Design a protein with these regions (language model features):
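Metal-ion/cofactor- or nucleotide/acyl-coenzyme-handling active-site neighborhoods
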Residues: 2-226
Length: 226
């Protein structure tokens, strides 16, 4: 049992297995630092990029972007674990070197009956592991304190990735970056590092996610890299 923001989170057998699987893709073990990247625009910062690349485990989500040689460094160049969903708009990085990464499929709306889709953008031999809704969604919903069952709500993919890092790696430093809703919980539109924008889906409650993330940041081991 770990204490996160004064709330006990029980690490079940399924979540322990998920942690072990994530660790196998880490750059170094034992894992002492985990970086989690959302996709909000980030300006150039060698310090931020280095902190991310120096992390033992780097988790990215959906339409992520990586630093490339010859361009200003912003968000680092590694992706060990990718948490993504079926409606992700792939970037040129999403499935690049996919055989070297762990892909965790977040599909919370399947819990509420949304049909399964298989995007043509996925590599035909893409191996992935679905996140266990039964173990994750109730815990996240309770921590967010939202009527997720009654109103068919779902956490954002970015928050899900951060929740996994904070809760499955309680002994580690957690480095968060690219989460715009922490500073703007009332936003109704996402803007992306890769470019473009989209509306915040109606099933999300980013005000609650911002509140929980702000609570995490009160812990010395959790930091936000703006």
């Amino acid at each position: 049992v770990t204490l996160i923001a004064e709330q006990a989170v029980t690490i079940t057998e399924g979540l322990s297995y998920l942690r072990d699987l994530m660790v196998t893709y880490a750059k170094r073990t034992p894992v002492t630092s985990v970086a989690v990247l959302g996709n909000a625009p980030l300006g150039p910062s060698d310090i931020r990029a280095q902190a991310i690349d120096d992390s033992d485990l780097v988790i990215r989500v959906n339409s992520f972007v990586l630093d490339v040689p010859g361009e200003p460094r912003c968000q680092g160049s590694r992706a060990d674990v990718v948490v993504w969903n079926r409606i992700t708009r792939p970037t040129r990085f999403t499935f690049d070197r996919y055989r070297e990464r762990l892909y965790l499929l977040a599909e919370p709306m399947r819990f509420h009956g949304r049909p399964e889709v298989w995007p043509q953008s996925w590599p035909p031999d893409l191996g992935f592991v679905p996140l266990p809704n039964a173990e994750i969604l109730p815990r996240i919903g309770d921590e967010l304190d939202i009527p997720w069952r009654a109103e068919k709500l779902a956490p954002t993919t970015g928050f899900t990735a951060a929740w996994l890092a904070v809760n499955l790696f309680p002994e580690c430093d957690i480095r968060l970056s690219g989460f715009s809703f922490i500073d703007d919980p009332g936003q109704t539109e996402w803007t992306y590092q890769v470019g473009g924008s989209s509306p915040v889906a109606p099933e999300h409650r980013i005000e609650a996610e911002a509140r929980v993330m702000t609570d995490w940041l009160k812990e010395e081991r959790v930091s936000l890299w703006r």
